[in-house]
């Protein structure tokens, strides 16, 4: 089997040598995709879809890589990287280069395989899309999820319709019926509806499953003509519905191994006009079985339990099957290789001549049903309303040709003529012809009973003797040999039976029933008298071969006799292997085309012909090993020459030595049950069986006794071992105790020595520590001394800097003080001038007020005198006038007091302003004085001695003079204010004094 790893390649060949699917279980190629870019090194394929031609398909893995595989051109190409897993694919659109892919984000995209560009992006689903169904025209598509199904127009990529359902009822699948305009919708409650695509009118509804059936439909498949619907689920039953009659017409029960059906698909056939008869059923064990829905026979199967299938897709023309395996790889199967043994020849066109009279019908009730223009397979005639007609037979030659007429309507003589003309049967129809020639009954029940008995004890260790690489092939061989051994006891002791059956097992490994019946038919007919001298080789058969060889080639036989080569050397190896060791596959098939088409003696004649055709190399052989090697290995011999020689021997051999006179004619296996095979020395076989049984029983008894003795011996040994272990343990404990004591003493001595060394080391460390501390102390003192010296230098530098700054500040301060003194003297003169002016103004106002009061008093006196004179005129008027005058006087006095108060307030404000300015100058002078006061004593003395004498005297006497001056000034201002206030009060309190 070829395997192709896509790796990181974007294109390449699918296979690098011509596939041979017939020798590899029908597998053309196995495709895997491994990469190092992602964490999982093997990328699993998830979905596959074929195009309309059936020669190309697309496949997508779980990382979103989509490849196109062209089986006709042997090429693959990476067409898209979607970066997310695809959940469904469709590749049969109207534009052949476009395909649909449903992604994990619930969207559907359309890509082009040629340009590798995005054509359209469709959204609308709210859950994962599980299937895409495309209309036969390629213009419409239905995408199905668990909650909805949507109909899309692929010309505009717009959604046309949407199928919504209740949440309690989920959608199982919605798809188009092939070659029709009908949509089939299947729901999780087993309801199935058919809708018109254009109007969405409900055409019909299928009734529910029959009572007693608890199957829930999960998977569906429809034939190409759209007439039959197959449904399955978690059961081994399949329901077949007739969509035209809208009824269930058949229930197929799969084998008991099948517990659930995961996928269904019909196998298309070019000759059935769309009414597919073969249904592929993928079950939970990963095996896909193909059954005939009419005969309910298992035809073949793909996949194994070890290498199970996850999903499969069949090409539209039925040539290929693409299966995604459970390990994530992709297998491509050839349907022709899988069905080569069951293929039937195309039915010829026939012409109905006339009806056969009823009185000429033989005991067989078989009749050939004639459909319009075709010949059907034979069927038993029952009471039926359908009229049947049969071909007219040659009544005169009926008895002669009776044995040449096969059940399938083939004529043995015509086949022999065809075989002689072409040398072999057509590869496509060989298996069908063999089954017809051997007249296999296909007893399913009988074969199942043999298989159900399990593997025979004689073949349990078959793999050790015959190590076959293919597990499936070994399993089929073991099952076939076990069935033969259960059928007849002789085959459990036949050593060459695996060699005899292996070619047929390899040829019919997909159909074990046919394989068993072919081998059984071969043994009954072509292995006649082989077991009469069991367990020795068939001496009588070998004698026949030797007699024929003596008649046709005495020289060669004499050469064998001279070299002590018996028939067990030159004949028996060919018979027990049926020429499989000396011929290739094609040569072997060609030979058995002739063997099955002739009398059983043809096989014995073939042995003679093989030797006579090889007489030249055989005459040159002298050693027995050379002869043995010759008859066990392939030789440069033309099989066509051998076959022609066989026919020549069959015709020219005398009747007295001809094997056909000693061998019976062909006898087919009986229908229903297999015949009893007892053509062997029963007493020998029974004796051997009894001996084997006795030996087996003795061996079992011996094994049981040996097991008992071994158990007892094991118990004794175990007890002895326990005792010995206990003594050894005690001895070890004693020795360990002594050793521990010695170790303890040694450790104590070592401890004392270590303590002494530790004390010495401790003393040394203390001394070192003292020295180190002393050195550290000295180092610290030196460091502190250096730091103090550095600080002193820093302080000296700081003092010098501050002295310089102080000198500069003092000089600047002296200048500022001189300037300030001048300013203050100017302000003092200004203030004195203002004060004099204000005093003069106040005195002037007082004088004016005094003069006014005097004039007013004189006027009042004058008026008083006048009033006295006019007192006779009325006392009330005088009294009112007096009150008015007093009010006027009070008003004038208040006005003057207010003016005097305002003048005093203004003067006091000016005094306070000048005092504030003087107060602002005092802190600055005091700060300068304090800075000089905080200098060090030595420095202050030094500075005073260095200062100018005039500056020193000024700085010492200036504060005292200023304080005296300020005090005198404030005192004068306060006295003046006091006098003015007293005068104002006196003038306000005693106005009558002024009047007097």
From Swiss-Prot:
Q: What is this protein called?
A: TBC1 domain family member 31
Residue span of region Mediates direct interaction with PJA2:
983-986
**Stated role:** Molecular adapter which is involved in cilium biogenesis. Part of a functional complex including OFD1 a centriolar protein involved in cilium assembly. Could regulate the cAMP-dependent phosphorylation of OFD1, and its subsequent ubiquitination by PJA2 which ultimately leads to its proteasomal degradation.
> What keywords tag this UniProt record?
Cell projection, Cilium biogenesis/degradation, Coiled coil, Cytoplasm, Cytoskeleton, Repeat, WD repeat
Q: Please give a single GO biological process term from the UniProt record.
A: cilium assembly
What's any one GO cellular component for it?
centrosome
Record domain Rab-GAP TBC: where? 424-599
Give the originating organism.
Answer: Mus musculus (Mouse)
MF term (GO), any: molecular adaptor activity
Compartments annotated for it: namely: Cytoplasm, Cytoskeleton, Microtubule organizing center, Centrosome; Cytoplasm, Cytoskeleton, Microtubule organizing center, Centrosome, Centriolar satellite; Cytoplasm, Cytoskeleton, Cilium basal body
Q: Where are the WD repeats?
A: 33-74, 75-116, 117-157, 158-200, 201-248, 249-296, 297-334
Matches recorded under Pfam families: RabGAP-TBC, WD40
Coiled-coil regions, chain positions: 388-414, 699-844
Subunit composition and interactions: Interacts with PJA2; the interaction is direct and recruits PJA2 to centrosomes. Interacts with OFD1; regulates its activity in cilium assembly. Interacts with PRKACA.
């Amino acid at each position: 089997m070829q395997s192709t790893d896509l790796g990181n390649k974007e294109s390449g060949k699918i296979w690098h040598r011509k596939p041979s699917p017939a020798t590899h279980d029908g597998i053309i190629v196995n495709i895997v995709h491994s990469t190092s870019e992602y964490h999982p090194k093997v990328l699993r394929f998830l979905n596959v879809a074929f195009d309309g031609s059936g020669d190309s398909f697309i496949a997508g893995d779980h990382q979103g890589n989509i490849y196109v595989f062209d089986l006709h051109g042997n090429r693959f190409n990476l067409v898209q990287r979607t970066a997310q897993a695809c959940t469904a694919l469709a590749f049969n659109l109207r534009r052949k280069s476009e395909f649909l892919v449903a992604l994990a984000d619930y969207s559907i995209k359309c890509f082009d395989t040629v340009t590798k560009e995005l054509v359209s992006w469709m959204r609308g689903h709210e859950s994962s899309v599980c299937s895409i169904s495309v209309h036969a025209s390629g213009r419409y598509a239905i995408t199905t999820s668990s909650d909805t199904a949507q109909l899309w127009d692929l010309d505009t990529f717009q959604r046309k319709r949407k199928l919504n359902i209740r949440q309690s009822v989920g959608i199982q699948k919605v798809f188009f019926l092939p070659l029709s305009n009908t949509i089939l919708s299947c729901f999780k409650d087993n309801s199935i509806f058919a809708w018109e695509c254009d109007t969405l009118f409900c055409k019909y509804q299928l009734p529910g499953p029959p009572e007693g059936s608890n199957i829930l439909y999960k998977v569906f498949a429809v034939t190409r003509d759209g007439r039959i619907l197959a449904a399955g689920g978690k059961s081994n039953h399949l329901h077949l519905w007739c969509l035209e009659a809208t009824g269930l017409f058949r229930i197929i029960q799969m084998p008991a191994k099948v517990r659930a059906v995961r996928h269904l698909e019909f196998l298309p056939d070019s000759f059935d006009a769309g009414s597919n008869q073969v249904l592929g059923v993928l079950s939970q064990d990963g095996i896909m079985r193909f059954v005939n829905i009419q005969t309910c026979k298992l035809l073949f199967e793909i996949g194994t339990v070890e290498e199970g299938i996850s999903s499969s897709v069949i090409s539209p023309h039925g040539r290929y099957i693409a299966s995604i395996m459970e390990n994530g790889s992709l297998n491509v199967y050839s349907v022709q290789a899988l069905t080569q043994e069951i293929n039937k020849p195309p039915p010829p066109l026939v012409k109905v001549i006339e009806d056969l009279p009823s009185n000429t019908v033989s005991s067989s009730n078989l009749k050939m049903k004639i459909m319009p223009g075709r010949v059907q397979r034979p069927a038993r005639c029952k009471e039926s309303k359908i009229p049947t007609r049969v071909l007219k037979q040659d009544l005169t030659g009926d008895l002669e040709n009776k044995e040449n007429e096969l059940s399938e309507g083939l004529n043995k003589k015509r086949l022999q003529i065809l075989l002689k003309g072409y040398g072999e049967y057509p590869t496509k129809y060989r298996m069908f012809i063999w089954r017809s020639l051997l007249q296999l009954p296909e007893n399913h029940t009988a074969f199942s009973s043999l298989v159900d008995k399990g593997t025979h004890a004689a073949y349990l260790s078959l793999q050790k003797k015959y190590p076959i690489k293919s597990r499936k092939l070994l399993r089929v061989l073991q099952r076939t040999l076990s069935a033969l051994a259960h059928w007849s006891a002789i085959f459990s002791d036949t050593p060459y039976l695996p060699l005899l059956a292996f070619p047929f097992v390899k040829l019919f490994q997909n159909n074990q029933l046919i394989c068993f019946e072919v081998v059984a038919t071969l043994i009954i007919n072509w292995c006649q008298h082989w077991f009469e001298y069991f367990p020795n080789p068939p001496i009588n058969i070998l004698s026949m071969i030797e007699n024929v060889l003596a008649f046709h080639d005495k020289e060669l036989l004499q050469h064998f006799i001279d070299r002590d080569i018996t028939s067990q050397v030159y004949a028996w190896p060919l018979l027990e292997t049926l020429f499989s060791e000396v011929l290739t596959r094609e040569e072997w098939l060609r030979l058995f085309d002739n063997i099955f088409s002739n009398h059983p003696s043809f096989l014995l004649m073939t042995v003679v012909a093989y030797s006579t055709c090889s007489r030249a190399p055989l005459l040159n052989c002298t050693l027995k090993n050379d002869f043995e090697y010759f008859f066990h290995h392939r030789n440069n011999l033309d099989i066509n020459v051998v076959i022609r020689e066989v026919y020549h021997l069959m015709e020219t051999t005398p009747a007295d030595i001809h094997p056909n006179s000693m061998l019976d004619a062909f006898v087919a296996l009986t229908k229903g049950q297999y015949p009893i095979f007892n053509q062997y020395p029963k007493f020998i076989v029974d004796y051997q069986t009894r001996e084997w049984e006795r030996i087996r029983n003795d061996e079992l008894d011996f094994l049981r006794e040996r097991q008992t003795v071994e158990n007892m011996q094991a118990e004794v040994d175990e007890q002895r071992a326990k005792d010995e272990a206990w003594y050894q343990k005690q001895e070890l404990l004693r020795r360990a105790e002594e050793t521990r004591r010695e170790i303890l003493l040694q450790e104590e001595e070592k401890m004392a020595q270590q303590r002494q060394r530790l004390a010495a080391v401790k003393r040394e460390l203390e001394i070192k520590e003292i020295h180190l501390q002393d050195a550290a102390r000295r180092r610290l003192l030196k460091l502190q001394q250096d730091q103090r010296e550095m600080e002193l230098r820093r302080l000296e530098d700081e003092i010098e800097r501050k002295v310089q700054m102080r000198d500069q500040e003092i000089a600047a301060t002296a200048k500022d003080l001189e300037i300030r003194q001048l300013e203050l003297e100017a302000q003092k003169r200004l203030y004195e001038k203002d004060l004099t002016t204000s005093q003069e103004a106040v005195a002037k106002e007082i004088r004016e007020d005094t003069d006014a009061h005097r004039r007013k008093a004189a006027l009042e006196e004058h008026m008083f005198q006048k009033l006295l004179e006019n007192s006779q005129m009325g006392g009330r008027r005088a009294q009112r006038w007096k009150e008015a005058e007093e009010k006027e006087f009070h008003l004038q006095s208040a006005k003057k007091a207010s003016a005097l108060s305002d003048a005093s307030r203004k003067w006091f404000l000016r005094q306070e302003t000048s005092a504030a300015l003087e107060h602002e100058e005092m802190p600055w002078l005091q700060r300068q004085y304090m800075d000089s006061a905080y200098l060090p004593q030595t420095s202050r003395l030094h500075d005073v001695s260095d200062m100018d004498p005039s500056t020193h005297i000024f700085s010492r006497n200036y504060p005292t003079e200023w304080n005296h001056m300020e005090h005198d000034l404030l005192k004068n201002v306060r006295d003046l204010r006091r006098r003015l206030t007293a005068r104002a009060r006196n003038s306000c309190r005693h106005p009558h004094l002024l009047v007097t």
